[in-house]
Amino acid sequence: MGSRSSTRIPVPLMLTVRIMLALSCVCPTSSLDGRPLAAAGIVVTGDKAVNIYTSSQTGSIIIKLLPNMPKDKEACAKAPLEAYNRTLTTLLTPLGDSIRRIQESVTTSGGGKQGRLIGAIIGGVALGVATAAQITAASALIQANQNAANILRLKESIAATNEAVHEVTDGLSQLAVAVGKMQQFVNDQFNKTAQELDCIKITQQVGVELNLYLTELTTVFGPQITSPALTQLTIQALYNLAGGNMDYLLTKLGVGNNQLSSLIGSGLITGNPILYDSQTQLLGIQVTLPSVGNLNNMRATYLETLSVSTTKGFASALVPKVVTQVGSVIEELDTSYCIETDLDLYCTRIVTFPMSPGIYSCLSGNTSACMYSKTEGALTTPYMTLKGSVIANCKMTTCRCADPPGIISQNYGEAVSLIDRQSCNILSLDGITLRLSGEFDATYQKNISIQDSQVIVTGNLDISTELGNVNNSISNALDKLEESNSKLDKVNVKLTSTSALITYIFLTVISLVCGILSLVLACYLMYKQKAQQKTLLWLGNNTLDQMRATTKM
């Protein structure tokens, strides 16, 4: 059966590819429009590109601490170099010992491997407590053990070279770059100049430069006396050690210039010491940086709320701090899995939450759907700058314009005031003077009022007050109920017994029957009386007619 080749993609990378493919099917997004929201106290402060980073890639940088002097100048620089060499050994020997203890704690036998590793870590940590980060750093140090051993095999050739930067590839499993900040100085100052320098000047120049570099080394490794091998080095520390030569390694690892500044600010580029050789004064550091995937159709929009005026007092809008928009979909973005820089978000995973229809409608520009909470105090800063203009609550503070002079008043019912250079060039707020350079064009909505129905109670103190009012209402109701019970208690219970009720019902029925019979009898008697009256009237009329007839005869 023939062999079958297969390509296995790491799960995080597959997740990244799927997300990017899914988002590529959605129409490109536009930034959340903050113009209709500004007058409602909701300010869009900026956008950041969303990136997802997965498993890290590594490379080694071998720092050559001791420079090689030109043959004709070795004698002049001998004294400062020897003093520098002794100081280096004193400073970095604890680091080398710590690295060796951790690397030697793990052998090929499986039984007590983990126990020996933890024991070695705790042995090099103050107070005998190993953090998760230190255990992770120790594990990375163990994984780099073979690479460090391969570098040490080449230490003589690395130490002998006069090149400031060169790649080391022989027998190494990952990219390694040997750099020498001091070698760069020697090459620039002595090897590439035709100017003859006297021995005293050479000694002074070398001594000063070596002292400066020792200061940088002390800054990098000084705070790590307790566990020097287990503390990560920041990108700033790496640049202090390697100088500008650090860029060479990062470029070789695939970091572009457009990405470099953002990654440096993120703190995702770190280093861990993996070897120190006092004989050749070589320091090996494994540099770790992330694999970054850019989500082209996704950006994070940051929202800030301003305390606005309402008929119920000062309130702030209930909206998420960060939202993301892809096409027509707007959702809240959880940034707890992300690292922020000035322009980018680097996330290990993308987590969003759907918003209620009211908040969605609010952020889409329907400010009448926005809800507000009475949680902002009177000491909250009542203004915010936006693109050279100011959004201020001029009911909470005095908006004094110095050019042209005057007081900017806020109309009754208006949430906030939008102030730009068209209305004021120099604005004073709480003693702070601002020169305005921006404008709110006609697309910005103004004179927005917050209705009473839009203000709800969410703060602890306000809820306590409302609960107090509810408790008072309940107490009043209980008082009324108690008063009613006292009146009911005065009722004769004997009159409300079952037998008494039956008697009352029976007598009531008899009374009703008697009443009906009396009514029928009365009607009959009235009818009979009227009949008798008609008979008597007829007899009278008949007798009168007979008398008239007799008289005529």
Curated annotation (Swiss-Prot):
Lipid attachment points (S-palmitoyl cysteine): C523
Gene3D superfamilies the record matches: 1.10.287.2480, 6.10.10.110, Head and neck region of the ectodomain of NDV fusion glycoprotein (2.60.40.1690), Newcastle disease virus like domain (2.40.490.10)
One cellular component term from this protein's GO annotations in UniProt: virion membrane
Positions bearing the site annotation: Cleavage: R116, L117
Keyword hit for Signal: yes
Region (Fusion peptide): 117-141
Membrane topology: Single-pass type I membrane protein; Single-pass membrane protein
Post-translational modification: The inactive precursor F0 is glycosylated and proteolytically cleaved into F1 and F2 to be functionally active. The cleavage is mediated by cellular proteases during the transport and maturation of the polypeptide.
Keyword line: Coiled coil, Disulfide bond, Fusion of virus membrane with host cell membrane, Fusion of virus membrane with host membrane, Glycoprotein, Host cell membrane, Host membrane, Lipoprotein, Membrane, Palmitate, Signal, Transmembrane, Transmembrane helix, Viral envelope protein, Viral penetration into host cytoplasm, Virion, Virus entry into host cell
Ranges per topology, Cytoplasmic: 522-553
Range of residues in the leader sequence: 1-31
Topology, Extracellular side: 32-500
One GO BP annotation of this record: fusion of virus membrane with host plasma membrane
Annotated TM spans: 501-521
Function: Class I viral fusion protein. Under the current model, the protein has at least 3 conformational states: pre-fusion native state, pre-hairpin intermediate state, and post-fusion hairpin state. During viral and plasma cell membrane fusion, the heptad repeat (HR) regions assume a trimer-of-hairpins structure, positioning the fusion peptide in close proximity to the C-terminal region of the ectodomain. The formation of this structure appears to drive apposition and subsequent fusion of viral and plasma cell membranes.
Family: Belongs to the paramyxoviruses fusion glycoprotein family.
Name assigned to this protein: Fusion glycoprotein F0
Taxon lineage: Viruses, Riboviria, Orthornavirae, Negarnaviricota, Haploviricotina
